[in-house]
């Protein structure tokens, strides 16, 4: 084996997909990481690095013993959020985008984004920004769990054109927080979306019967990297 071949094999073996993880409303990076332990364990054979971040908007709580919770934006003046009600109010959103851009600059580049609920709604906006020329926010794919189209009127512009980003949309048949119809509607704004409906509710499915869906989707991007290396 020559030195060039050894270099290629080393590059392939060291290549790790880097995925940004965006939590849901009333969560944090820490909480989301704890809740997705089974998900990460199911993907341990795939070379992936997960980066968890916490939204910049703290949700007020009158209970001192409750772990701090955060959101990506609020839909009312009272600093609350309703995912399914149309609103012209979007407090904290600009700060969120500034924060996300900083994450991409300091902790990127990222290959993909993995997100849940309000985080998945935010991710749909990031996917639209992803195709903008010169955007700091750049990634190859997005996995959105219990996602939905943002109901903020300020975000309508992001859904005017088909979103050109590889996407996996996962949602629950019995989800009472974000009914599956909302996730199905979000998927229709994407070009060639991959959809998977599990029989459960509002959570990240991670049992053995579900993990293959994630593996099949993510491995396409590992294969693309291998092909690029082989053609060098």
Question: What residue ranges belong to the model's regions?
Answer:
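Short beta-strand/loop motif that positions the catalytic acidic residue
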Residues: 163, 168-171, 175
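Serine-hydrolase catalytic machinery in alpha/beta-hydrolase-like enzymes
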Residues: 16-109
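Short alpha-helix in the alpha/beta-hydrolase fold that links the catalytic acid
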Residues: 34-37, 156-157, 179-188
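A conserved short beta-strand
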Residues: 134-149
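Acidic catalytic loop of the alpha/beta-hydrolase fold
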Residues: 150-151, 173-178, 202-203
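Gly/Ala-rich beta-loop-alpha elbow adjacent to hydrolase catalytic centers
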Residues: 114-123
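Post-His helix in hydrolase/transferase enzymes
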Residues: 206-220
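Catalytic histidine neighborhood in serine/cysteine hydrolases
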Residues: 188-205
């Amino acid at each position: 084996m020559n030195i060039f071949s050894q270099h290629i094999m080393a590059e392939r073996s060291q290549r790790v997909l880097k995925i940004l993880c965006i939590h849901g409303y009333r969560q944090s990076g820490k909480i989301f990481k704890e809740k997705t332990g089974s998900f990460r364990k199911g993907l341990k054979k795939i070379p992936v690095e997960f980066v968890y971040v916490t939204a910049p908007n703290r949700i007020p709580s009158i209970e001192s013993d409750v772990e701090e919770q955060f959101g990506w934006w609020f839909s009312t003046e009272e600093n609350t959020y309703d995912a399914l009600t149309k609103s012209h109010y979007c407090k904290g959103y600009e700060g969120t985008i500034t924060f996300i851009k900083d994450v991409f600059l300091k902790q990127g580049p990222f290959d993909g984004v993995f997100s849940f609920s309000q985080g998945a709604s935010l991710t749909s906006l990031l996917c639209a920004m992803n195709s903008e020329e010169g955007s700091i926010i750049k990634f190859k794919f997005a996995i959105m769990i219990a996602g939905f189209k943002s109901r903020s009127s300020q975000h309508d512009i992001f859904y005017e054109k088909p979103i050109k980003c590889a996407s996996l949309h996962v949602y629950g048949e019995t989800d009472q927080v974000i009914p599956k119809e909302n996730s199905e509607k979000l998927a229709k704004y994407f070009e060639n979306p991959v959809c998977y409906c599990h029989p459960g509710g509002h959570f990240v499915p991670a049992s053995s019967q579900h993990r293959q869906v994630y593996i099949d989707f993510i491995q396409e991007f590992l294969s693309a990297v291998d092909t690029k290396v082989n053609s060098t």
